[in-house]
């Protein structure tokens, strides 16, 4: 019996498959996709947003409860101190949830309520997280996408308000040139009564000049080498001098004679300073030591060691640190006079420190060396660095400060700069002109001082002259 495989025309093969007992094709596809989702869904599909958000809420709430529980409220003592009269309140800022509706500001720390409020905003949900993060980092504002935010604008305003503007200082002009020395003028000191000043030079002579007329009043001889430092006592009629002959002398200005010698330095003495309130004299020199002397008994009270090269300048004041020294080893040292020990060593300078200056009223001082950023301001007593005085690229030999916050710096190449001491900005540049007959190389400035009024500046230079600059009213 033969079976025909042909199907009648117009008949389909579908009924024959159903008749064989197999399920429909649509049911097979649906069952297969469901099974595939169950088996491979954990590896290929993204984690459900609802579960992730719920986990983040639990994590954040736990962190707030554990880590910030103790600091959410102030202790009773601090809370009582802060319950005093308050000033006018600031205008209330829009809430985080409200700002999220208008822009992409992101709350950094918040509880579940903040998360719930932000998730209820359709714009925040619809916007991709990467775009929100990018806009937050760039600081885009909600109005027009400008690259500034309220926070950055407030910080910029505060920074501008903190900038200190320099004071107005009148110009300074050269008013007198005094000749008389036969060598480089290396030291100058002012009379406490503002009547005369003394100068010392390479000709081994100390000359005393009348401040008003510029006339020579007296010449003192006794040193056998270049005079490097002079100081006049505020409480005694004494003039102190030091020189490269290792000698420190005390001159009685009533008899114009040397009444005391201070022996102890092993090499030339380059600087000295008289303590303003104690009968103490401080000297520094090429033997890398700072020596403290009893003015009356000539005893060497302390020998302060620590520098490894020539001590270029030394200053004293009545408050700590009572002794400040600058050395050719590129350091500035602050000394405790009572203990005879070093309090601090400042190593900011890269080259030799040749000059120091203490502000007459402000609790600070300045130091100078050579190279860039060569003048630095420091705050006492720890010697905290304040700022640089940028703009005088030369070897600075001398610094002076008056009570009107004018800092003067004189350099080896004959350049002079006047600074606003508060801000560190220069307001006038001058050039030392050598006297006729001198070489251009003899334009260096070695010493300087303001008079007691702060309106006249006296400098000594390599052209063997003394120059007086006056403030123009």
Curated annotation (Swiss-Prot):
Alphabetized Gene3D superfamilies for the sequence: YVTN repeat-like/Quinoprotein amine dehydrogenase (2.130.10.10)
| Function comment | Involved in pre-mRNA splicing and required for cell cycle progression at G2/M.
What UniProt keywords apply to this chain's record, in alphabetical order? Cytoplasm, mRNA processing, mRNA splicing, Nucleus, Repeat, Spliceosome, WD repeat
Q: Which InterPro entries match?
A: G-protein_beta_WD-40_rep, Prp46/PLRG1-like, WD40/YVTN_repeat-like_dom_sf, WD40_repeat_CS, WD40_repeat_dom_sf, WD40_rpt
Q: Mainly localized where? A: cytoplasm
Please tell me the species this chain comes from. Cryptococcus neoformans var. neoformans serotype D (strain JEC21 / ATCC MYA-565) (Filobasidiella neoformans)
Q: Which Pfam families match?
A: WD40
What GO biological process terms does the UniProt entry carry, in alphabetical order? mRNA splicing, via spliceosome
Question: Where in this protein does the record put region Disordered?
Answer: 1-21, 103-126
- Location(s) in or outside the cell: Cytoplasm; Nucleus
Detail the disulphide connectivity of this chain as listed in its UniProt entry: none
SMART domains assigned to the protein according to its UniProt record, in alphabetical order: WD40
Q: Which family does it belong to?
A: Belongs to the WD repeat PRL1/PRL2 family.
Protein's name according to its UniProt entry: Pre-mRNA-splicing factor PRP46
**In which ranges do the WD repeats occur?**
180-219, 222-261, 264-303, 306-347, 349-388, 391-429, 440-473
Q: Does the keyword Cytoplasm apply?
A: yes
Q: Name one GO cellular component term.
A: Prp19 complex
Oligomer and partners? Associated with the spliceosome.
- Keyword Transport tagged: no
Q: Where is the composition biased (Polar residues)?
A: 1-10
């Amino acid at each position: 019996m033969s079976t025909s495989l042909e199907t009648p025309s117009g008949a389909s093969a579908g009924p024959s498959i159903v008749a064989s007992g197999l399920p429909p094709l649509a049911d097979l596809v649906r069952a297969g996709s469901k099974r595939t989702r169950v088996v491979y869904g954990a590896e290929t599909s993204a984690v459900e947003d609802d579960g992730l958000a719920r986990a983040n809420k639990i994590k954040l709430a736990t962190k707030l409860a554990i880590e910030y529980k103790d600091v959410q409220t102030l202790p009773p003592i601090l809370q009582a101190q802060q319950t005093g009269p308050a000033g006018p309140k600031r205008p209330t800022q829009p809430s985080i949830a409200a700002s999220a509706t208008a822009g992409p500001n992101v709350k950094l720390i918040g509880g579940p309520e903040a998360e719930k409020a932000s998730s209820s905003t359709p714009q925040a949900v619809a916007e991709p997280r990467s775009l929100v993060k990018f806009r937050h980092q760039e600081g885009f504002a909600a109005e027009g996408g400008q690259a500034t935010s309220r926070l950055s604008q407030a910080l910029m305003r505060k920074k501008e308000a903190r900038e200190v503007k320099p004071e107005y200082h009148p110009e300074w002009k050269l008013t007198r040139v005094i000749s008389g020395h036969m060598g480089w003028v290396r030291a100058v000191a002012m009379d406490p009564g503002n009547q005369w000043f003394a100068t010392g030079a390479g000709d081994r002579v100390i000359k005393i000049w009348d401040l008003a007329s510029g006339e020579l009043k007296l010449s003192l001889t006794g040193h056998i080498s270049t005079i490097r430092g002079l100081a006049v006592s505020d409480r005694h009629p004494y003039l102190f001098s030091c020189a490269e002959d290792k000698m420190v002398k005390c001159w009685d200005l009533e008899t114009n004679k040397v009444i005391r010698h201070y022996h102890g330095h092993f090499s030339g003495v380059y600087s000295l300073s008289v303590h303003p309130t104690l009968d103490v004299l401080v000297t520094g020199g090429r033997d890398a030591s700072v020596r403290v002397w009893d003015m009356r008994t000539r005893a060497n009270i302390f020998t302060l060691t620590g520098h490894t090269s020539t001590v270029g300048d030394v200053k004293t004041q009545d408050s700590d640190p009572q002794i400040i020294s600058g050395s050719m080893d590129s350091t500035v040292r602050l000394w405790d006079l009572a203990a005879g020990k070093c309090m601090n060593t400042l190593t900011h300078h890269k080259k030799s420190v040749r000059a120091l200056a203490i502000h007459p009223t402000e609790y600070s001082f300045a130091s100078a060396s050579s190279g860039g950023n060569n003048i630095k301001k420091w705050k006492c007593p720890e010697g905290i660095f304040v700022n640089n005085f940028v703009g005088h690229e030369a070897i600075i030999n001398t610094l002076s400060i008056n009570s009107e916050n004018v800092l003067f710096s004189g350099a080896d190449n004959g350049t002079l700069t006047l600074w606003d001491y508060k801000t560190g900005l220069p307001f006038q540049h001058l050039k030392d002109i050598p006297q006729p007959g001198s070489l251009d190389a003899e334009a260096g400035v070695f010493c300087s001082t303001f008079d007691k009024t702060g309106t006249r500046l006296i400098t000594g230079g390599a052209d063997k002259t003394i120059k007086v600059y006056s403030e123009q009213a």
